[in-house]
C-alpha cells in the first residue's frame, strides 16, 4: 500500500510539472481560462511594442483584470431593478401650519429633497459639476420610477374612495389650526376621491387622482407607458428572437420554467429588450480587444486537446527501423508548457480569424531547428488560411512558411527527382518531379486568391441565411465544411478532402515524399474533424454581440496587406515552429458548452443598455457645457467622459477598460462616440432619456442662474392688530416672483470683476450700485439652491451672504486677488409668529437688518394657500394595479435555454 502511495505521489508531482500530459487527453481549456490566457498574451504584446517605440506612449503596466469577475458583475446587474413596487405614491407636498386659520404654507417636497443632493458647484472643477448633475438625475429617476400596487382604499356610501395616505399631500398636522367649516370642506373633498376601474391591455387596474410634483409625474408616466407597451408585443418579439438564436446555436429549450402569460391577472415587465443592437457595443472607443476577450470568456466551450491514433505514425513515417526523414524524427517529441501555450494561440487564431493572427516567434539565439522548421512549412499550408477574405497568419509568416516548404522539398536534392527552377529565384518558384512535374508556385502565398493555403479553391466565408445578429451574417467554412453537419468522430472525414490538401499530396508524391504523403492521407479524417469542430464553435458558440462585425471583418486582410490602420486591427501573437507540429497532431474537442451561454443575450443586452445610457449622458453633458459656459469655464470634452465613467457601474467600466484602453482614448474618440445614433432600448434608457428632458430646465434640479444682490431691509411690521396679523399669515422670503428690469441690473463678468479688483475699486463699485438701489448679477453661473425655514430671524451668514467669494492676499510684495462665483445660495422662508402679549414694536429693531441675496425661480416651491384649497394639487391621474395582480419581472427568464409560454395577445 505504501509503495502504491509513493507511485501515486510521484505521478502527481510529474503532472504538476507537466500539466499537459495525461494520456490521449493533453489539456482541458474552457472559455474563462483561454480568455485570461489571451488577455495576458495580448497585454504582453502591447507592452513589448510600446517599449520598442521611440516615442513614449502612456504606461499600461497594470494588473491583468479577471474577466470572469467582470462578467459575473454584469450578470449581477441583472438582479438590480430600475423601479420599485410600492402601495402609495410618495408625498409630494407637505403643509406647514401658520397662526392663521385661513392660510397655510404648502411646500413641494421634491424640490426640497432635490436641494439636499450634492454640494456647491465649483467652476474650476468641471468633473465635480458633471458628477453633481448625474447625481441629481439619479435621484430624480429613483423618485419617479415606481409602480403602484395594492393601494389603500375605503368604502364610503357604497363607493370605493382613496385613503388620505395615498393622495400625495401631507396635511394632517395643519387640521388642528383650521376652522371647522374648512375641515368639513377638506373632508368632503376626500369623500369625493372615488377609485375608478380601468384597463391596461386586458388587465383590470385602479385609476385615481393624487398630488405629485411634475418631474416625478413625468418619470412615472414614462414607466407606466413602457409597461403598457410591453403587454402588446415586445415580450413576444424577444421570445421569437431567442428561439431563432437557439436554433442557430443548437440549444435545446428546457421546460423548467413555464409561465402562463395568458392569465388575466398577470402583468409582465421586461427591463431589457431583445434583440441586441450590437453596434452599440462596437461603437465604444478602442473596444475590439475587450470585445474579443469577452467573446472568448462568454461563449467558448470547455474542450480538451486530443491526439490521433498513434498507429498512423507506425504505418507511415516511422515504419522503418532507421528514421531519417523530418517527420519521423520529430514524431516522438513531447511539448513543453511554453510550446503548449503556443498551441493555444494557434487554436485561438483559428477560432478568431481576422481578429487574432499569428507570426513566427523570433529566436534570439538564432538556433532554429531546421527539421522543425521544414515540417512546419509543410503543415502550415494545410493548417492556416491566407486569403482571399480571412487570414490566420501575417504576410511575414506566409513568406516564412513558403521558404520553409521550399527548403523541405529541396533538402534531399538528387538526380532521381529533377528540379527546374523558375526565373525569379523566389521560394517555391520551381517545378519538381520526374515524369509529371509539379509546379510548386501553386503553393506560393497569394492573399488575393488564397493560393497556397486552406482558402484556395473554396468559399470559406458565406452568407447563407439570416443570422439572429444583424452585424454578423457570415458563416465560416474552413475546408469547405458545413458546420451544420453531424460529426461522428468514428466515421467523419472518410473520403473527404479539399483542394489545397489534394494539391499537397500531389506535390509530395511528385517530390518523392511518399511516406509523408501517406501520413497526411491517413491524418485527413482527423484533420477534417478538427476544422469541422472549429466551424461549429465559430458559427454557433462564438456567435454573439461581441463577434466582429462583417464590415470590419471583410477589410482586415486588405488593410493588413496595404499597411492601412483600421478601427479593429488584428492582434498578432507569436508562435514557434515546433508549435505548428504540436497543433497539427492535436485537435480541440469540445466536451461541454459554456455555462454562461444561455445568459449571454441578457448580459449583452445589459451591457449595451448601460453603454447607451452612458452615451446619452456624455451627449447631454456636452450640450450643457455649451449652454452654461460660465459654470464650467475650463471644461474639456474628455471631462464629460471621465465624469460619466466615474458614475458608471463598476463591472461596465472594467469591461470597457479590459485591455487598459482608457489610457489611449482621446478627444476625437469621445466626440465621435457621443455622436453615434445607435441605441439599445431598455427601461433604464427610457427613464434616463426622460430625466434629461426634465433636466433641460435647470430649476427642476434646483440649479439657478438668476441670483442677484440687492440690499433691502428685512420686514419689521408693526403689530397694531394682532388678530389681523395672524389672519394674514405673514411670512418673508428672498425668492422674488419676477426678474428685475434688465436696465436696473449690472452684470459682472469675470473680466469686469478682475479689472475693477486690479484697479482697487471693486468693493467701492459694488457699494455705489447697492446705494443706488441697483441689482447686481455675478456671471451666468448655475448655483445649487438650499431651502431653509425659520420661525425667527435667520442668522447673519444667511442674510448677508454674497453669491461670490472674493479673496485678497499679498505674495512676495505683490497684491493678489481671486474670484469664485460658484457658491451655494440659500432660499429662506421666515414665518412670523406673534403672541397676544406682544407690543406693537416687538418686531421692530432700532438698527434695521439687511438682506442681500435675491433668487428668482419660475417654479413655485412654497405657496401660501387658503385652507379649503389644501387639496388643490390633487390633479394627477395615476394607475395602480390591484393587490391580487401578479407583477412579474421576466427579464431574468429571457435566457436562450429556457422555453417560455408564448403570449397570444
From Swiss-Prot:
GO molecular function: structural molecule activity
Keyword Amino-acid biosynthesis applies: no
GO cellular component labels: virion component
Transmembrane segments: none
Subcellular location: Virion
Main localization category: virion
Keywords carried by this UniProt record: Virion
Keyword presence, Iron: no
Family that this chain belongs to: Belongs to the orbivirus VP3 family.
Function summary: The VP3 protein is one of the five proteins (with VP1, VP4, VP6 and VP7) which form the inner capsid of the virus.
Record protein name field: Core protein VP3
Amino acid at each position: 500500500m505504501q509503495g502504491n502511495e509513493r507511485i501515486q505521489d510521484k505521478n502527481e508531482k510529474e503532472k504538476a510539472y507537466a500539466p499537459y500530459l495525461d494520456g490521449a487527453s493533453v489539456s482541458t481549456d474552457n472559455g474563462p481560462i483561454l480568455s485570461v490566457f489571451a488577455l495576458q498574451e495580448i497585454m504582453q504584446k502591447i507592452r513589448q511594442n510600446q517599449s520598442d517605440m521611440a516615442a513614449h506612449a502612456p504606461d499600461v503596466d497594470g494588473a491583468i483584470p479577471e474577466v470572469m469577475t467582470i462578467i459575473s458583475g454584469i450578470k449581477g446587474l441583472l438582479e438590480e431593478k430600475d423601479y420599485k413596487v410600492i402601495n402609495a405614491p410618495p408625498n409630494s407636498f407637505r403643509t406647514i401650519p401658520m397662526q392663521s386659520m385661513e392660510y397655510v404654507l404648502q411646500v413641494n417636497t421634491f424640490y426640497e429633497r432635490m436641494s439636499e443632493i450634492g454640494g456647491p458647484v465649483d467652476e474650476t472643477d468641471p468633473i465635480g459639476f458633471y458628477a453633481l448633475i448625474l447625481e441629481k438625475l439619479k435621484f430624480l429617476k429613483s423618485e419617479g420610477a415606481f409602480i403602484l400596487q395594492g393601494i389603500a382604499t375605503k368604502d364610503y356610501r357604497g363607493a370605493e374612495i382613496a385613503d388620505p395616505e395615498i393622495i400625495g399631500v401631507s396635511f394632517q398636522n395643519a387640521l388642528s389650526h383650521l376652522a371647522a367649516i374648512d375641515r368639513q370642506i377638506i373632508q368632503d373633498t376626500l369623500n369625493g376621491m372615488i377609485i375608478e376601474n380601468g384597463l391596461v391591455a386586458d388587465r383590470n387596474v385602479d385609476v385615481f387622482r393624487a398630488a405629485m410634483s411634475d418631474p416625478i409625474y413625468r418619470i412615472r408616466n414614462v414607466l407606466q407607458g413602457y409597461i403598457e407597451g410591453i403587454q402588446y408585443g415586445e415580450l413576444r418579439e424577444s421570445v421569437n428572437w431567442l428561439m431563432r438564436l437557439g436554433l442557430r446555436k443548437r440549444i435545446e429549450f428546457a421546460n423548467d420554467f413555464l409561465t402562463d402569460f395568458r392569465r388575466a391577472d398577470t402583468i409582465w415587465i421586461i427591463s431589457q429588450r431583445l434583440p441586441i443592437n450590437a453596434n452599440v457595443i462596437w461603437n465604444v472607443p478602442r473596444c475590439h480587444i475587450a470585445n474579443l476577450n469577452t467573446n472568448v470568456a462568454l461563449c467558448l466551450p470547455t474542450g480538451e486537446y486530443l491526439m490521433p491514433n498513434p498507429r498512423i505514425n507506425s504505418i507511415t513515417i516511422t515504419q522503418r527501423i532507421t528514421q531519417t526523414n523530418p517527420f519521423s524524427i520529430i514524431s516522438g517529441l513531447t511539448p513543453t508548457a511554453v510550446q503548449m501555450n503556443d498551441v493555444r494561440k494557434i487554436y485561438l487564431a483559428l477560432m478568431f480569424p481576422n481578429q487574432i493572427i499569428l507570426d513566427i516567434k523570433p529566436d534570439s539565439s538564432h538556433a532554429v531547428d531546421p527539421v522543425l522548421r521544414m515540417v512546419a512549412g509543410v503543415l502550415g499550408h494545410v493548417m492556416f488560411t491566407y486569403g482571399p477574405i480571412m487570414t490566420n497568419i501575417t504576410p511575414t509568416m506566409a513568406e516564412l512558411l513558403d521558404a520553409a516548404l521550399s527548403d523541405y522539398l529541396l533538402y534531399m536534392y538528387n538526380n532521381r527527382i529533377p528540379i527546374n527552377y523558375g526565373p525569379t529565384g523566389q521560394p517555391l518558384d520551381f517545378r519538381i518531379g520526374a515524369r509529371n512535374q509539379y509546379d510548386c508556385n501553386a503553393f506560393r502565398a497569394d492573399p488575393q486568391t488564397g493560393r497556397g493555403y486552406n482558402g484556395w479553391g473554396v468559399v470559406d466565408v458565406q452568407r447563407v441565411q439570416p443570422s439572429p445578429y444583424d452585424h454578423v451574417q457570415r458563416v465560416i467554412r474552413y475546408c469547405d465544411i458545413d458546420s451544420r453537419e453531424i460529426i461522428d468522430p468514428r466515421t467523419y472525414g472518410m473520403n473527404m478532402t479539399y483542394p489545397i490538401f489534394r494539391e499537397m499530396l500531389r506535390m509530395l508524391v511528385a517530390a518523392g515524399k511518399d511516406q509523408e504523403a501517406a501520413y497526411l492521407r491517413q491524418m485527413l479524417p482527423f484533420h477534417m474533424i478538427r476544422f469541422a469542430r472549429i466551424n461549429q464553435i465559430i458559427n454557433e458558440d462564438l456567435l454573439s454581440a461581441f463577434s466582429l462585425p462583417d464590415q470590419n471583418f471583410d477589410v482586415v486582410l486588405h488593410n493588413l496587406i496595404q499597411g492601412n490602420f483600421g478601427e479593429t486591427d488584428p492582434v498578432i501573437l507569436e508562435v514557434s515552429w515546433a508549435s505548428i507540429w504540436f497543433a497539427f497532431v492535436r485537435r480541440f474537442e469540445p466536451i461541454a458548452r459554456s455555462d454562461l451561454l444561455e445568459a449571454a443575450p441578457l448580459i449583452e443586452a445589459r451591457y449595451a443598455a448601460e453603454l447607451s445610457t452612458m452615451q446619452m449622458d456624455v451627449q447631454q453633458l456636452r450640450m450643457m457645457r455649451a449652454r452654461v459656459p460660465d459654470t464650467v469655464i475650463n471644461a474639456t470634452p474628455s471631462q464629460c467622459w471621465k465624469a460619466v465613467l466615474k458614475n458608471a457601474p463598476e463591472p461596465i467600466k472594467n469591461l470597457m477598460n479590459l485591455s487598459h484602453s482608457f489610457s489611449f482614448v482621446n478627444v476625437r474618440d469621445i466626440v465621435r462616440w457621443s455622436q453615434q445614433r445607435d441605441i439599445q432600448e431598455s427601461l433604464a434608457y427610457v427613464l434616463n432619456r426622460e430625466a434629461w428632458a426634465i433636466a433641460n430646465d435647470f430649476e427642476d434640479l434646483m440649479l439657478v442662474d438668476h441670483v442677484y444682490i440687492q440690499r433691502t431691509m428685512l420686514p419689521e411690521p408693526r403689530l397694531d392688530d394682532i388678530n389681523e396679523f395672524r389672519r394674514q399669515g405673514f411670512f418673508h422670503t428672498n425668492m422674488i416672483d419676477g426678474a428685475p428690469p434688465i436696465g436696473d441690473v449690472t452684470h459682472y463678468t469675470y473680466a469686469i470683476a478682475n479689472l475693477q479688483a486690479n484697479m482697487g475699486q471693486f468693493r467701492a463699485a459694488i457699494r455705489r450700485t447697492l446705494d443706488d438701489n441697483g441689482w447686481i448679477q455675478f456671471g451666468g453661473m448655475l448655483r445649487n439652491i438650499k431651502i431653509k425655514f425659520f420661525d425667527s430671524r435667520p442668522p447673519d451668514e444667511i442674510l448677508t451672504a454674497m453669491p461670490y467669494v472674493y479673496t485678497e492676499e499679498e505674495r512676495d510684495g505683490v497684491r493678489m486677488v481671486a474670484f469664485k462665483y460658484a457658491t451655494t445660495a440659500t432660499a429662506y422662508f421666515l414665518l412670523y409668529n406673534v403672541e397676544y402679549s406682544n407690543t406693537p414694536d416687538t418686531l421692530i429693531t432700532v438698527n434695521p437688518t439687511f438682506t442681500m441675496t435675491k433668487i428668482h425661480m419660475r417654479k413655485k416651491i412654497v405657496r401660501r394657500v387658503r385652507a379649503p384649497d389644501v387639496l388643490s394639487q390633487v390633479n394627477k391621474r395615476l394607475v395602480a394595479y390591484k393587490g391580487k395582480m401578479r407583477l412579474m419581472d421576466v427579464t431574468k427568464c429571457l435566457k436562450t435555454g429556457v422555453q417560455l409560454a408564448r403570449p397570444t395577445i
